[in-house]
Amino acid sequence: MSGQTSFYCGLLLVLLIQAQARPRSDDSLQTLSRLLEDEYGHYLPSDELNNEAQEMSPAASLPEFNADQSDLELPWDRESREIGGRPFRQEAVLARLLKDLSNNPLRFRGRSKKGPSRGCFGVKLDRIGAMSGLGC
């Protein structure tokens, strides 16, 4: 009897996993796309940068390549258009992230007014509020 019980439990588990693994509907993908764009849209480059990138690309100067490009549509390109994602360049995103990091002030990690430097093992805060180093 335990063999049949374990078989049915396993079968139930497989059916549950298959039910969870089915693809999401297009509505949920569009909703997710809108939420991500609202949340992280400021990291994407503006349309001006996209226009400059298209002008600078060597493919834009070849008319026969542009004619053939519409025939050779890749699935990930089609999906990005369907979701409403704008094409972006990794360099522009990286440049914006580095600019944001350089504009944020870094926290001073030296000696503080309340105690010694942090040393090898950090500091200990005593009951009376005094900080002492744990040594090296």
Swiss-Prot record:
InterPro entries assigned: C_natriurtcpep, Natr_peptide, Natr_peptide_CS
Signal peptide as annotated in the record: 1-21
GO cellular component term, pick one: extracellular region
Tissue: CNP-115 is differentially processed to produce CNP-38 and CNP-39 in the heart and CNP-22 in the brain.
Disulfide partners: C120-C136
Compartments (UniProt record): Secreted
One Gene Ontology molecular-function label: hormone activity
GO biological process, one term: receptor guanylyl cyclase signaling pathway
Keywords: Cleavage on pair of basic residues, Disulfide bond, Hormone, Secreted, Signal, Vasoactive
A Pfam cross-reference name: ANP
Location, primary (coarse class): secreted
Family per similarity comment: Belongs to the natriuretic peptide family.
PANTHER family registered for this protein in UniProt: C-TYPE NATRIURETIC PEPTIDE, C-TYPE NATRIURETIC PEPTIDE 3-LIKE PRECURSOR
Function as written in the Swiss-Prot or TrEMBL entry: Hormone which may be vasoactive and natriuretic. Has a cGMP-stimulating activity.
Name of the protein this chain belongs to: C-type natriuretic peptide prohormone
Native source organism of the sequence: Triakis scyllium (Banded houndshark)
